[in-house]
């Protein structure tokens, strides 16, 4: 089971652009250690082309320079990607949560549990 939710945080005007820039700086300098109760084990910064591992080691991302994107990966498969929009006054969060589904009858329960996790992540990142 996998569920992805996009959260758009709109901050119009010059002050909004400054706020979005500051949010990215804060996330880059102080990345979350947990998301919705799950431990973050890998942090990727596609602007710096750098990955920070749970043990504190850093590795370079072997790819061409890309964009101002951060990704956080948890021990349970949860993933959060964050990036400012290039064309609109907003910052976008892509939240992905996972669960083991053995048969279709478990879907509704996993969907509800997935949304609980998404809401916990949003609360932890102060996106509500």
Predicted regions and their residues:
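Intrinsically disordered, low-complexity regulatory segments enriched in Ser/Thr/Pro
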Residues: 83-108
């Amino acid at each position: 089971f996998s569920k992805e939710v996009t959260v758009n945080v709109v901050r119009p005007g010059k002050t909004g652009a400054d706020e979005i820039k500051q949010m990215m700086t804060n996330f880059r300098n102080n990345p979350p250690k947990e998301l919705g109760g799950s431990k973050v084990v890998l942090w990727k910064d596609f602007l710096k082309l750098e990955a920070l591992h749970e043990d504190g080691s850093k590795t370079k991302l072997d790819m061409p320079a890309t964009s101002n994107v951060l990704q956080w990966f948890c021990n349970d498969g949860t993933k959060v990607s964050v990036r400012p929009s290039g064309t609109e006054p907003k910052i976008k969060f892509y939240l992905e949560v996972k669960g083991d589904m053995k048969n279709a009858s478990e879907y509704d329960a996993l969907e509800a549990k997935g949304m609980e996790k998404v809401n916990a992540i949003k609360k932890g990142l102060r996106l509500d």
